[in-house]
Amino acid sequence: MLSQTISEARSFLADVLDFVFPRHCTVCGERLQKDEQFLCADCLLHLPRTGLASAEGNEIEQLFWGRVDIQRAMSFFKYHSASNYHRILMDLKFHGKPEIGIFMGRLMARELVATRIFDGVDVIVPVPLAKSRLKKRGYNQSEMIARGISEITGLQIDTRSVVRTKANVSQIGKGRQQRQENVEGIFSVADSDALKGKHVLVVDDVLTTGATTISLISEIQKVCDAKCSVLTMAVASN
């Protein structure tokens, strides 16, 4: 009886808060229903998913061929700066909303777990941020996505074994070669024993040329015998 009363009180309070402080869809701006989070049902339905999880040798994996050795790679949805779905990344990276990263991580994991992309993975390594950017933002957006994935899959997150040793300038506006040069030597493996013999899932927010991820994986594979796969929330689309 008491538990039912508490549950009803919580539901009533949630209704009041939603009335006073209505929540809106990140993508379209429409008011969210009680059971919706961040994205309304329509925007969630039309999220431009890549559908690449079950396709070995897909276009995401091909970005890494001949550059680093990977097991699997895929991105969850396609993003373009002119699309309203760009707002997901903007809120996560620049508008101080880490919770949307956790939400997207959960969404990705729920939809992808049946594709077996997580099979054999031992640990998740979110791409580290430079200390200066972490201090400014207050959180690592890739770690937020990783947290959501971890909640659904049970995979552990390792934020200590790989560190970012310097802050590179923004990749925005740079070509492929410039991007690769910009990220050379920015990572270091602090604990190779923790990753030795493991299958590491590298998680990041958005994939463009793959330069940052390649730099990180190269550093891991220089110092320890580890398999690596890649999962990003989004991939830049022309």
Specify the residue positions occupied by each region the protein language model found.
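Glycine-rich phosphate/pyrophosphate-handling loop used in enzymes and phosphotransfer proteins
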Residues: M1-V203, T208-N238
